[in-house]
A protein has these predicted regions:
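Oxyanion-hole/transition-state-stabilizing segment in secreted/luminal serine hydrolases
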Residues: 1-46, 79-90, 178
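Short beta-strand-loop
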Residues: 22, 80, 85-87, 256-273
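Von Willebrand factor
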Residues: 214-269
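Structural recognition of the beta-strand scaffold that forms the well-ordered cores
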Residues: 6-11, 16-18, 71-76, 128-132, ...
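Mobile gating loops/cap/lid regions near enzyme active sites that modulate substrate access
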Residues: 82-107, 114-188
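Hydrophobic, aromatic-enriched interface-forming segments
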Residues: 51-91
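Second-shell loop/turn segments in exported
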Residues: 41-49, 98-101, 179-186, 221-233
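Short, amphipathic alpha-helical "lid/cap" segments that border enzyme active or binding sites
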Residues: 48, 52, 56, 188-199
Length: 273
């Protein structure tokens, strides 16, 4: 991240609370288990305070790096299930997984909202905007937790799909996918709805840097932390970056995309680059 960066937008915390384990143990047919799902959700709730602490540390490193007029936007998470009654009942354990996972998302929003308020009160040099409307905007558009159904108005990829986009009939159509990186992340329509929320709350970002005097090619690097939940998915992410590179080569100006694997944390990366 260069010192003249104008805008930083990010989500944070999902990997810290082992989001992928929750998807597997609570929603994936053949793997879901009431006892383990309950434990994973409870464990995630206990980690929310550490997520808050880690986020504040990262914001401090951003503040140390960027100019005072930079914009920082933290985007909240949607819930991961509709309010359909969804009970896991096996091995002598009965657990309301739907309610538990939705409650975790609500708690995450409260934590992030509080940390942004605390940050802005004590750090006048760098203000952070929190996009807190994601949960309400996505209400009714989350994945259907039942493996027997899909929510036809979902804005989040369910299992085994990607590229979900709303059609003229008001329903989502998607492509099949075995890439676990796509599951339970916003689909195309979901990303568009998040973009609307950002535009409504922040408007079009203003950039104060002067236009570069030369029209040189652009290099973009993806730095992947392979120590956490991404460690088993680095290959799939590299493949996706390569797909983007092939498409971009057909369109000027030339943009070079690189994927770099690192065993450092994000906070360390910000400190050393």
């Amino acid at each position: 991240m260069s010192e003249d960066t104008n805008l930083v937008m990010f989500t944070i915390g999902g990997n810290d609370v082992n989001f992928s384990d929750i998807v597997k143990e609570c929603f994936t047919l053949g793997l879901r288990d009431a006892k383990t799902c309950k434990e994973k959700v409870a464990d995630a709730n206990t980690k929310l305070e550490s997520v808050k602490s880690n986020t504040l540390t990262i914001l401090q490193k951003i503040d140390n790096k960027l100019k005072n007029d930079a914009q920082v936007i933290l985007v909240g998470y949607p819930r991961l299930a509709t309010n359909r009654n969804y009970i896991l009942d096996n091995s002598g354990v009965r657990y309301d997984a739907g309610a538990g996972v939705r409650s975790l998302s609500d708690a995450s929003m409260e934590i992030q909202s509080t940390l942004v308020q605390e940050w802005n009160k004590s750090h006048p040099s760098l203000k952070v905007t929190y996009i807190d409307g994601v949960i309400n905007t996505f209400d009714g558009h989350e994945p259907d937790p039942s493996p027997k159904h899909r929510n036809p108005q979902r804005w989040i990829n369910e299992l085994l799909e990607t590229e979900g986009k709303i059609k003229d009939n008001g329903q989502i159509e998607s492509e099949s996918s075995s890439d676990t990186n796509e599951f339970y992340h916003p689909n195309i329509t979901g990303h568009a709805e998040i973009a609307k929320l950002i535009a409504e709350k922040v408007g079009v970002p203003t950039f104060n840097n002067q236009e570069p005097s030369t029209k040189s090619d652009i290099d973009i690097a993806f730095v992947i932390d392979s120590t956490g939940s991404m460690k088993d998915n680095v290959g799939a992410l590299r493949a996706r970056v390569n797909e983007i590179m092939k498409k971009q080569k057909k369109v000027p100006p030339r943009i070079a995309l690189h994927s770099l694997t690192t065993r450092t944390t994000l906070s360390s990366t910000l400190k050393t680059t």
